[in-house]
Amino acid sequence: MKKFNKDIGTYCEKLSCDYLIEHNFKILECNFKNFLGEIDIICIKNSILIIIEVKGRYNYEFGLPKESVSISKQKNIIKVTKSYINYKKLYNFNVRFDVIEIYLNKLNSSYKINHIKDAFRT
């Protein structure tokens, strides 16, 4: 099950990157990892550094995708973001935290993207 979830996560992240590029976001990182954790996508648009958590679902059995971005997950994303900003010296950017929800059908042949801007704050 873990490999299946990882494959779905990778697929959803690729769909998200394609969506963001199509909407004129500049992708800086996909799957950025350090000793603190991971950020799915880091990008820039209109001089804003945007940190994106990607969540995909086949159904609502476990709730909406955005609901799985818990307070503790948000705090971890914020910690990793601060570390990334220091590492890359990106001090002159405002930062926004978004969530991209992807709703998949059972065959992965169609999907719907919901981009939630400013989904949470520091």
From Swiss-Prot:
Pfam families named in the record: UPF0102
GO molecular function: nucleic acid binding
Coiled coil: none
InterPro entries given in the database record: Restrct_endonuc-II-like, tRNA_endonuc-like_dom_sf, UPF0102_YraN-like
Protein family: Belongs to the UPF0102 family.
HAMAP family (alphabetical): UPF0102
PANTHER family: UPF0102 PROTEIN YRAN (PTHR34039:SF1)
Entry protein name: UPF0102 protein CLL_A1253
Source organism (scientific name): Clostridium botulinum (strain Eklund 17B / Type B)
